[in-house]
Amino acid sequence: MKQVDLNADLAEGCGSDEALLQLITSANIACAQHAGSIADIRAALAYAQQNGVRIGAHPGYPDRENFGRTEMNLSEADLRACLNYQLGALQALCRDQGLEMAYVKPHGAMYNQAAKNRALADTVARIVADFDPKLKLMALSGSLLLEAGKAAGLGVISEVFADRRYMPDGTLVPRSRPDAQVDSDEEAIAQVLQMVRDGRVKAVNGSLVAVQADSICLHGDGPHAVVFAEKIRQELLAAGIKVSA
């Protein structure tokens, strides 16, 4: 039986965390830099604990104004401080509630930059490995960040996106483009099933791109987030695919 993990970005102040944590199997917990607060983190951790959901850190650039989606070029020392600050805070809050942090998934611009920039990818992976070599690194399927995680000796989680379109090189269509998002739930469900069952996704030019779907990212914000997550989970189960971290 095929198996896939469902993840979503939480503790970003969007208000749907409690409901989503009854549907997903991995929670990417924002670390109060690009969005959210300590109260949001503690609440998300409590809901995750209630539902047996795997916990990961979701650190981003310190860019609240743009939700961590603006590219930055930090020095290695500044990036190390930025990540250690966030990982350390979440790890402490996890331990305070008797929980373990299992993986790291960078947020927004950091995630996308590291997917294409090997030097940045190596730096991020090295910082995570230095912080705790037992942590896994979640990154875009086929990305340089995924390769860097393996090279650093980390376990990796290959991620695909339910509601984002893909470029022919396997990267995500930039959010600045009008075709970045998948238009309908039906199209997103078809894309998810294709990625999980066939290991392929249709790019914007019609070509098929190979992907490894260990985990599917679902949108965690907006009023439709919970309904969308319910549909994706139901369709996976109906197709005989186990949903588990």
Swiss-Prot record:
Superkingdom as given in the UniProt entry: Bacteria
EC supergroup of this enzyme: hydrolase
Enumerate the Pfam families for this protein. Answer: LamB_YcsF
Mind telling me which SUPFAM superfamilies this protein's record contains? Glycoside hydrolase/deacetylase
Record-level GO BP terms: carbohydrate metabolic process
Give the matching Gene3D superfamilies: Glycoside hydrolase/deacetylase
InterPro entries, A to Z: Glyco_hydro/deAcase_b/a-brl (IPR011330), LamB/YcsF/PxpA-like (IPR005501)
The GO molecular function terms of this record are: 5-oxoprolinase (ATP-hydrolyzing) activity; ATP binding
Q: Supply the alphabetized keyword list.
A: ATP-binding, Hydrolase, Nucleotide-binding
The reaction(s) annotated as catalysed by this protein in its Swiss-Prot or TrEMBL entry are:
5-oxo-L-proline + ATP + 2 H2O = L-glutamate + ADP + phosphate + H(+)
The signal peptide here is: none
List the EC numbers from the record: 3.5.2.9
By sequence similarity, the record places it as follows: Belongs to the LamB/PxpA family.
Subunit organization: Forms a complex composed of PxpA, PxpB and PxpC.
Protein function: Catalyzes the cleavage of 5-oxoproline to form L-glutamate coupled to the hydrolysis of ATP to ADP and inorganic phosphate.
Protein name (database record): 5-oxoprolinase subunit A
Q: Which organism is it from?
A: Neisseria meningitidis serogroup C (strain 053442)
